[in-house]
């Protein structure tokens, strides 16, 4: 048995081509008819007349044959067109029947799960609508989530994208209406599929106000890529920031990249939260892991986190082989062994580093009474807690971001120096405004500068006495700080004593305190540690130049 495959579009095209050929031939025959059917005799004699008549008859016979061929050609073209129409009609009928059969088959397959679970077994989720803005879930076995509805009314957020089942991609989040947030992207399939991108926030319609926040990007399951967060909505007015960018979605647990945060704010500023009075923190995403609370520490250089902050053991494996292995510690009584990996750090609002060094703690050992007691207390509540997690968890911190260019370590580099463009020039710690700003120094002049960050020389007055030069560390993560005993002339902190700190013997005063209100720890030797106090009431900018030394810039010296 033979099979014939016909493409109606090709038949229609062929019929048109054949018709064009026929038209060309008819035109040529018509042009030649006059000169071939009525020839003039070459002379007045009988022979010339007979020859002319003979050739004229040939022309007339050719025209008769051409007319018959033209009629056949027209019939052939009509047959082609008729066949094309017949095949097209048959194809449409079959397609309709197949669609009906497919619909009926899917209906039969999906009916049990829709009845029991409210979602199909196979098929894409429906897109969101004005009355039901969230996209529908994809089929439990196969199917993409529906896209969220993009709102147009003021104050109405975008719909969330639907999530996939076993295999499929998450739906995109819908755009927010004016002054409203975008919808979250749907999650990709549990086995395979990508997350849906977060919806953009709506633009502000209120003068001087930022737009809506971007939606969170959808996460992947085992295999797939997490999606980027949605962009924050545009602000209303010149110089007005966008809304906050949405967070990126987690990548596949076994394979796949992670999404990054959407553009937001002014593209260089993130919130700075002060916890427990002395701990300046930001929220960052390392290696696409969970959002972590990170201490901003001018007293060290390099980012130190636990495995949980990079996505657990699977996150560690995603980063590949470490580039180094070393040991470091904190003065509060904690030593740790860490491996250095290369990955990105996402501070939010689209502020993401290039691949940079990140230190992941493999083993930690408490050595001080505080660190030991804190660890055992945490261990009773959670047997999986490590000494590192307990040490910083006591103050609500997950890791430490060292930003001091001439700090001792742990290194090997400062992640904020891997930010793109001019964002890598320095960082402003603005505790009064609750902001961390990346890039060139935004502080208005005049400012007071101290060469070195964090290690420099400061001058200390005790109750208005002669300034004493003291090697110091300007340490935002130093809590209440330390002071050498030789500076105060005692091994214990005297009560009701006024202590002032200056840039030079006759220079500007940077900060001051009374020992009844602020009590640094007295040490027998070593550097004076300012603790957080200089940062508490004034913005302080850490300039990464000169290279390897840095400059500390105070906006409003006390």
From Swiss-Prot:
GO terms for biological process: proteolysis. The active site is at 297. Disulfide bonds: none annotated. Keywords: Aspartyl protease, Hydrolase, Protease, Secreted. GO terms for cellular component: cell surface; extracellular region. It is found in: Secreted; Cell surface. GO terms for molecular function: aspartic-type endopeptidase activity. Residues 1-93 form the PE domain. Undergoes auto-proteolytic processing. Aspartic protease that processes the lipase LipY and other PE_PGRS proteins. Can also cleave itself. Belongs to the mycobacterial PE family. PGRS subfamily. NCBIfam families: PE_process_PecA. This is PE cleavage protein A. It comes from Mycobacterium tuberculosis (strain CDC 1551 / Oshkosh).
